[in-house]
């Protein structure tokens, strides 16, 4: 049976990337514990509007753990203390206790400038994909589905890599602000398949160069990214990306 909880919510307010920003505080009363975290934020916005205050801004879309837009730093943890493999929108208030102080912040990264409050611009990930996260194909008739033989193991591993939703939790958790888990997942999903091999060297070099250009840091293997990834991406992908990158550089 659901019960109601009351708590103090500290949420980040910032008018843009150059604004200093600050925390505002709001007392949330009698919130059902079967309410999702984003539904609770909806209630916050309604209460702020009714009080004549500026509403709180955060990003969201599908609310089904698919799109990766609900990127919030909750009590010092990307996506909050959810079940392993879950996003902010899959976090429920039963995870919190009556009287708690809950802190909500945006992703903190030079590569993710704040648009407003807790909404950040994750367009840097799109630019990394545009640098090489694709295969070049001729237009025309598609190949027969069974024309290229791929082992079940390779197909499964490539699909696991492809489940990355580009939410940015890996960057937010990393002390260096590295996007290596994201980049390595996108490189791996193609490197594991024969369609991705012809451009593998070019892809690894181009995507890492773009990642560095956009202000993301380097990986130092602390595995913080792996611990918070909502799709359970493995740092084995980072090892694969390093192999792809070193091989490409040696071949130059």
Tell me the role of every PLM-derived stretch.
Residues 74-97, 101-104:
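Glycine-rich phosphate/adenylate-binding loop and adjacent beta-alpha elements
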Residues 4-27:
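Eukaryote-biased recognition of intrinsically disordered, low-complexity regulatory segments
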Residues 12, 29, 74-76:
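Short strand-turn-strand beta-turns centered on an Asx-Gly dipeptide
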Residues 21-39:
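Short, flexible N-terminal segments of the mature chain
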Residues 22-28, 86-88, 175:
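Well-ordered beta-strand positions in beta-sheet-rich domains
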Residues 35-54, 102-252:
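Ferredoxin-type iron-sulfur electron-transfer modules in oxidoreductases and energy-metabolism complexes
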Residues 57-69:
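Short, structured protein-protein interaction patches enriched in aromatics and acidic/basic residues
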């Amino acid at each position: 049976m659901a019960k109601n909880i009351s708590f103090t919510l500290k949420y980040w307010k910032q008018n843009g990337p150059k604004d200093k920003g600050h925390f505002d505080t709001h007392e949330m009363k009698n919130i059902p514990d079967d309410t999702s975290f984003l539904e609770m934020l909806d209630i916050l916005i309604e209460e702020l509007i009714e009080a004549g205050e500026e509403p709180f801004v955060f990003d969201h879309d599908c609310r089904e753990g698919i799109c990766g837009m609900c990127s919030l730093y909750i009590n010092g943890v990307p996506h909050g203390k959810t079940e392993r493999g879950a996003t902010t929108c899959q976090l429920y208030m039963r995870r919190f206790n009556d009287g708690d102080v809950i802190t909500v912040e945006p992703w903190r990264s030079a590569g993710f400038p704040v648009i407003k409050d807790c909404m950040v611009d994750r367009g840097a990930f799109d630019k990394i994909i545009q640098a090489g996260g694709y295969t070049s194909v001729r237009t025309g008739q598609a190949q027969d589905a069974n024309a290229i033989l791929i082992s079940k193991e390779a197909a499964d591993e490539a699909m696991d890599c492809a489940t990355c939703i580009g939410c940015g939790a890996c960057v937010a958790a990393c002390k260096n602000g590295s996007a290596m888990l994201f980049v390595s997942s996108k490189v791996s999903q193609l490197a594991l398949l024969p369609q991705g091999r012809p451009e593998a060297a070019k892809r690894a070099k181009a995507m890492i160069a773009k990642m560095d250009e956009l202000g993301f840091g380097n990986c130092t293997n602390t595995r913080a990214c792996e611990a918070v990834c909502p799709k359970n991406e493995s740092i084995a992908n980072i090892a694969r990306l390093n192999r792809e990158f070193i091989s490409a550089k040696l071949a130059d």
